[in-house]
A protein has these predicted regions:
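Short glycine-centered helix-capping/turn motifs at secondary-structure transition points
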Residues: 76-77, 92, 108
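Short alpha-helix plus adjacent loop in nuclease-associated cores
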Residues: 63-74, 78
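Active-site-proximal, substrate-binding regions of enzyme catalytic domains
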Residues: 1-42, 58-60, 70, 83, ...
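Short beta-strand scaffold positions
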Residues: 45-46
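Long, amphipathic alpha-helical surface segments
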Residues: 93-97
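Alpha-helix capping/helix-boundary segments
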Residues: 50-51
């Protein structure tokens, strides 16, 4: 499947920074964080707790998958977050009842 035209694939310039991050987090997250440090005003989508903590320490803006879904609802792109939360729960993605309730409140569905 081909990617939409608005998707741009970038490579990290500073591979040493990425390798240092790989000592603490997975390659995907380390690559994303290293690239965010090279692209001003970027916002990462991170769900991994450790990666989010590192991004926060480095001053990188981030959100999670659920945050993207909430934003899509609030911007009128999707009518409801509930079906997406249900799909997420069918995967190995862990979402607590507390986080789900918070998401529903933020999306004005509770």
């Amino acid at each position: 499947e081909t990617l939409p035209d608005w998707v741009i694939i970038e490579n990290v310039s500073d591979k040493s920074r990425q390798r240092i991050l790989e000592l603490q987090i997975d390659r995907g997250e380390s690559s994303a964080i290293a690239l965010a440090l090279e692209i001003p005003k970027s916002t990462l989508i991170l769900d991994d707790f450790k990666a989010r903590k590192i991004a926060q320490q480095l001053g990188i803006s981030f959100t999670g998958t659920i945050g993207v879904i909430i934003k899509a609802k609030l911007n009128g792109i999707i009518p409801s977050i509930k079906p997406y939360l249900e799909k997420i729960k069918e995967t190995n993605f862990r979402i607590s009842a507390e986080i789900e309730l918070q998401a529903l409140k933020e999306a004005k569905e509770y």
